[in-house]
A protein has these predicted regions:
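Active-site groove signature of glycoside hydrolases
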Residues: 154-155, 183-226, 310
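Glycan-recognition patch characteristic of GH18 chitinases/ENGases
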Residues: 43-192, 227
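Conserved, mostly hydrophobic/aromatic
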Residues: 81, 151, 209, 239, ...
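N-terminal module-boundary/linker segments of secreted carbohydrate-active enzymes
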Residues: 20, 29-82, 86, 252-272, ...
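Substrate-binding surface in catalytic domains of secreted glycosidases
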Residues: 97-119, 214-392
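Extracellular low-complexity, Gly/Ser/Thr-rich intrinsically disordered linkers
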Residues: 27, 395-470
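Secretory targeting and sorting signals
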Residues: 1-29
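An active-site-proximal structural segment forming one wall of the substrate-binding cleft
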Residues: 168-207, 235-244, 289-302
Length: 470
């Protein structure tokens, strides 16, 4: 079983030595009601994106099912669900199967769900071609028209082979074709009654490339090389070309079918579906410059999801903020946005990442409010030390044993009981961030990951309300 994406615990750790090279963040308050609204006046602005990552492995130990998104009301407040993750093989192809640590077809499309765990209350049968998460996502879309589901490729653990897979034009074409065949066309490997040609057709509405990171060191064993930057640009171009070509072929097939049924006269030709193309991208300017030709890439991306968390992690010797809106001479949401804009990214294609978890330290000394103080190590937690879900941290805050501290000027919060500290985002912090998104004319918000929220989807709701207030 894949573990939770602990990737995001180590991103900042890899790059902390580089933090001094980052340009200073803006002082707090810049852009807040001070003429910071960059949207053109008099034009209707497209709806803000509210994106959540759904983890493939969360259905096991965490028992977080697709149906939980329906019963909590979360699905109705999301625009996109990114399914994490699809893997790329050593042969340079998208693939699935039942291979521990590499693929989990059982969770994806083979596992039967009973009526109680099914989005529409109907249990899976032994003979249907599609079951598992993919079938539940299909049902979730039926209940929530307009909701898009994207397959996210890679992640911290599964970015191993990207660099090798994109070295030539032929290898890029083969990789992209394999991903479209598996996820967009839905041609799943046969697994007993499950799978087959077109079994998952219509489940996915686009592709999210989560290569961590082109041109930069990341997880142990992940290949990277200097030419990743140009190859990544070419890969994204190939995804856009092949997705558009497939959409046009679908539209032609529909037109031919309508014509064959005598509906061809007096009817408009079907408009090709637009498949979204996005990526998860780093906050560290060194990583941006090493792997991302921003101006060229953004022509093909519909949007990118900015790293808005793990600015500091529990493996560090001192406590610090992990997701501040502003920070001086440090990583922050505002600094990340400005670094991408400075390199040519349109503001209306930038989605701000938000955590549904906290980073925590124990053995904190030095007194005061705990922030910026020495610690002995990561705080004990439910699934991995130093990393705890918001739903658990909320209970700590409500218990009275921890005090909630806020830096309202810089937009972040933390819990401290005298020895243990957790830095996290709560609804109050998210309200400040949604105001920032609106003021700056950004594209919206993204959550890593949906299983960390409360049972009633408190964080997703806060962002939905903040982005869509009138």
């Amino acid at each position: 079983m894949r573990r939770r994406n602990l990737s995001r615990l180590t991103i900042a750790g890899v790059t902390l030595a580089l933090v001094a090279t980052a340009a200073p963040a803006a002082t707090a308050g810049s852009g807040h009601g001070k003429g910071g609204d960059d949207r053109s006046k008099g034009h209707h602005r497209p709806a803000y994106k509210n994106i959540g990552y759904f983890t493939q492995w969360g259905v096991y130990g965490r028992d977080f099912q697709v149906n939980d998104l329906q019963t909590s009301g979360t699905a109705a407040k999301l625009t996109h669900i990114n399914y994490a993750f699809g893997n790329v093989s050593a042969e340079g192809k998208c693939f699935t199967g039942n291979i521990p640590g590499q693929a989990d077809a059982w969770a994806d499309y083979a596992r039967p769900l009973d009526a109680a765990n099914s989005v529409d209350g109907v249990a899976d049968t032994d003979t249907q071609p599609l079951a598992g998460n993919f079938n539940q996502l299909r049902k979730l879309k039926a209940k929530n028209p307009g909701l898009k589901v994207m397959i996210s490729l890679g992640g911290w653990s599964w970015s191993t082979h990207f660099s090798d897979a994109v070295r030539t034009d032929a290898s890029r074409k083969a990789l992209v074709a394999s991903c479209i065949d598996l996820y967009i066309k839905g041609n799943l490997p046969q697994d007993g009654a499950r799978g087959g040609q077109g079994a998952a057709a219509g489940v996915f509405d686009g592709i999210d490339v989560d290569w961590e990171w082109p041109g930069s060191p990341a997880n142990e064993g992940t290949v990277f090389r200097p030419e990743d930057k140009k190859n990544f640009t070419a890969l994204i171009r190939e995804f856009r070309v092949q997705l558009d070509a497939y959409a046009k072929s679908q539209a032609r097939a529909k037109a031919q079918s309508a014509k064959g049924k005598g509906h061809g006269h007096g009817h408009h030709k079907p408009k090709p579906k637009h498949y979204d193309l996005s990526a998860y991208v780093p906050a560290n300017p060194k990583a941006i410059d090493a792997g991302f030709d921003v101006k060229r890439l953004m022509k093909d991306f519909d949007f990118v999801n900015l790293q808005g968390y793990d600015y500091h992690v529990s493996g560090e010797k001192k406590t610090a903020q992990q997701s501040a809106l502003y920070a001086k001479n440090d990583f922050s949401v505002d600094q990340t946005v400005r670094d991408w804009v400075k390199r040519g990214a349109p503001k209306n294609k930038l989605v701000v990442g938000m955590p549904t978890y906290g980073q925590g330290w124990t053995g904190v000394t030095g007194g005061g409010k705990g922030l910026g103080q020495p610690a002995t190590g990561p705080a004990p937690a439910t699934w991995a030390n130093g990393y705890e879900d918001y739903k658990v941290l909320k209970k700590l805050a409500d218990s009275g044993t921890f005090k909630v501290h806020r830096d309202t000027k810089n937009g972040h919060a933390w819990l401290f009981d005298g020895t243990t500290l957790w830095t996290y985002d709560d609804p109050q912090v998210l309200r400040a961030k949604t105001s920032y998104i609106r003021d700056k004319g950004l594209a919206g918000a993204m959550f890593w990951s949906l299983d960390g929220d409360t049972e009633d989807g408190e964080l997703v709701t806060a962002v939905h309300r903040g982005l869509n207030r009138r």
